[in-house]
């Protein structure tokens, strides 16, 4: 049904019924036709005025927009051509705080609304019959709907279309969200490396070159296959004759004994010693080779020292502790694997620092012994880390006052080397008391009085009171007799300026969030009957990678 905007009356000039009693009918028809022509001319003039008036209004609005655009272009041209780079007209803060430009042009939407109804259509609408007065029943409805909308609702089709568009947009957003969640929950599968293709023709060409050249090429090919496909054997899928041919010429069993031993030696040198494994146990001697191992307690540390007779040095100091020693440190960088293997085969137990000088030199050159040096690693020797220092057997006191009586109560008696070797192994010493218990019996002190020869100088060369046998405890471990009471600090209270600043920052953040929320709500209100916005929103959701790219996303504010 076409919608007539302008209707010219009358349509027919001469189609009129003549009244009765007219004698001159021709003159009457002429007058009626002339009057209808005048009426039509008046209608045409009226509609012409409407048409040209609309054209004038459109031209006026167009000229106004062009003039405003020209003024803006002139201002920009002046700013661009006459801009002084030395003078900063706008600060960086003003530029960042300025909002993005938004056009204020109102797009033509809802063309068939009551507000956009033209005057000729309004006149035609006024001629029509009015609907029944159903709005009178609206206050009596419980659902709040207008009563007239059940009879006539101009926005029915638009509301139906809008609801369908918004529902489709929401469904697509939910589908994308589910797909994204599914991708996050799915574990990341490692990429599978394809197996290298097998070139049989190349292998036969290498075999045709001769057994000498084929041997090196086959070794190189085997290395490449192991690098590409891992240690899994690739030759199992080949014919059995080719495997036999390869194994027969240069297999390990076909090598002479000298080459085989050399390969095994190289393989042993490639073995890395793990730093966290304990050292190998000493070899077990036979019943006839068993030698007594003297045991002593060091006067400096109170630790038990077993000194087995080594064939190389005569004695090898080894620390023995009631508790298992900590794991050994890693190998130094300067230590080679060959020297390590040689030292492990020659010296079974892992020794510590080099042995002290023999007793003869100690008797001939009496001197004050230096303080115990830190443990050093001999070249080619692995040893466990030194055990922790045992707690002192006497009550803690200043180190200078403690050194003299300790030196006096520990006499040193040198023993000949033959007696040391002929003595039977002494019984195991009693365990050391815990740190918190003070020893009540002098058993441990008497055990300290007979160390083996060669460990300490003679009584004539004993160190004086100024040389402490035990390392002095650090000052941090000295417990003061009386601790001063701690009083509450009398520092000035921090000013409230910092808290006020933090409160202002929190309020600013909260205000910013409220402003963003209001802007978002204003966008949602703008969607109400905006056809272009609804369509653009749907297109944005369809073609975006994520649901967050949409300009209007109410999920962040509604959830």
From Swiss-Prot:
Tissue: Highly expressed in brain. Lowly expressed in testis, ovary, colon, kidney, pancreas, thymus, small intestine and peripheral blood.
CDD domains in the cross-refs: WH2_WAVE-1
Related illness: Neurodevelopmental disorder with absent language and variable seizures: A disorder characterized by neurodevelopmental abnormalities, including moderate to profound intellectual disability, with autistic features, seizures, severe impairments in speech, and gross motor delay.
UniProt gene name: WASF1
Asymmetric dimethylarginine: residues carrying this PTM: 341
Sequence segments annotated as region (Disordered): 170-202, 304-400, 412-491
Regions of compositional bias (Pro residues) in chain numbering: 322-332, 347-360, 384-399, 423-437, 460-477
Major site of localization recorded for this protein: cytoplasm
Post-translational events: Phosphorylated on tyrosine residues by ABL1 and dephosphorylated by PTPN12.
The protein's name: Actin-binding protein WASF1
Family to which the UniProt record says this protein belongs: Belongs to the SCAR/WAVE family.
Organism: Homo sapiens (Human)
Subunit structure: Component of the WAVE1 complex composed of ABI2, CYFIP1 or CYFIP2, BRK1, NCKAP1 and WASF1/WAVE1. Within the complex, a heterodimer containing NCKAP1 and CYFIP1 interacts with a heterotrimer formed by WAVE1, ABI2 and BRK1. CYFIP2 binds to activated RAC1 which causes the complex to dissociate, releasing activated WASF1. The complex can also be activated by NCK1. Binds actin and the Arp2/3 complex. Interacts with BAIAP2. Interacts with SHANK3; the interaction mediates the association of SHANK3 with the WAVE1 complex. Interacts with ABI1 (via N-terminus).
Residues covered by the WH2 domain: 497-514
């Amino acid at each position: 049904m076409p919608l007539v905007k302008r209707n010219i009356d009358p349509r027919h000039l001469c189609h009129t019924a003549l009244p009765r009693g007219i004698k001159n009918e021709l003159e009457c028809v002429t007058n009626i036709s002339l009057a209808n022509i005048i009426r039509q001319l008046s209608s045409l003039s009226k509609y012409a005025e409407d048409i040209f008036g609309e054209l004038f209004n459109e031209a006026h609005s167009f000229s106004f927009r062009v003039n405003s655009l020209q003024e803006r272009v002139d201002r920009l041209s002046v700013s661009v051509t006459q801009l002084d780079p030395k003078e900063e007209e706008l600060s960086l803060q003003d530029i960042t705080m300025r909002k993005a430009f938004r056009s204020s042009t109102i797009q033509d939407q809802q063309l068939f609304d009551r507000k956009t109804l033209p005057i000729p259509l309004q006149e035609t609408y006024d001629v029509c019959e009015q609907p029944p007065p159903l709005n009178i029943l609206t206050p009596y409805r419980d659902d709040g709907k207008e009563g007239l909308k059940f009879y006539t609702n101009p926005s029915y089709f638009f509301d139906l279309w809008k609801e369908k568009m918004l529902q489709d947009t929401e469904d697509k957003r939910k589908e994308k969200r589910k797909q994204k969640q599914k991708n996050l929950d799915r574990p990341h599968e490692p990429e599978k490396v394809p197996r290298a293709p097998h070139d049989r023709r190349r292998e036969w060409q290498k075999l045709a070159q001769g057994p000498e050249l084929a041997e090196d090429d086959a070794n190189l090919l085997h290395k490449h296959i192991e690098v590409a496909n891992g240690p899994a054997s690739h030759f199992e899928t080949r014919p059995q004759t080719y495997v036999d041919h390869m194994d027969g010429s240069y297999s390990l069993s076909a090598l002479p004994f000298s080459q085989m031993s050399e390969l095994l030696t190289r393989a042993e040198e490639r073995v890395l010693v793990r730093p966290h494994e304990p050292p190998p146990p000493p070899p077990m001697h036979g019943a006839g080779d068993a030698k007594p191992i003297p045991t002593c307690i060091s006067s400096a540390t109170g630790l038990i020292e077993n000194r087995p007779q080594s064939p190389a040095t005569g004695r090898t100091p080894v620390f023995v502790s009631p508790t298992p020693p900590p794991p050994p440190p890693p190998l130094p960088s300067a230590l080679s694997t060959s020297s390590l293997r040689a030292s492990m085969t020659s010296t079974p137990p892992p020794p510590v620092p080099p042995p002290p000088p023999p007793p003869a030199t100690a008797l001939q050159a009496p001197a004050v012994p230096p303080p115990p040096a830190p443990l050093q690693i001999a070249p080619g020797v692995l040893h466990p880390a030194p055990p922790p220092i045992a707690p002192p057997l006497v009550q803690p006191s200043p180190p200078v006052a403690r050194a003299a009586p300790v030196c006096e109560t520990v006499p040193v008696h040198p023993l000949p080397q033959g007696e040391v070797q002929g003595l039977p192994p002494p019984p195991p010493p009693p365990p050391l008391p815990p740190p918190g218990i003070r020893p009540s019996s002098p058993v441990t002190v008497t055990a300290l009085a007979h160390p083996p020869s060669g460990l300490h100088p003679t009584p004539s060369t004993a160190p004086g009171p100024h040389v402490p046998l035990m390392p002095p405890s650090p000052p941090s471990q000295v417990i003061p007799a009386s601790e001063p009471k701690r009083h509450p600090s009398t520092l000035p209270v921090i000013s409230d300026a910092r808290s006020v600043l933090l409160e202002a920052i929190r309020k600013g953040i909260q205000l910013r969030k409220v402003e963003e929320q209001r802007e978002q709500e204003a966008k949602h209100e703008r969607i109400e009957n905006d056809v272009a916005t609804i369509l653009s929103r749907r297109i944005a959701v369809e073609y975006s990678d994520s649901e967050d790219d949409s300009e209007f996303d109410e999920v962040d504010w509604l959830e």
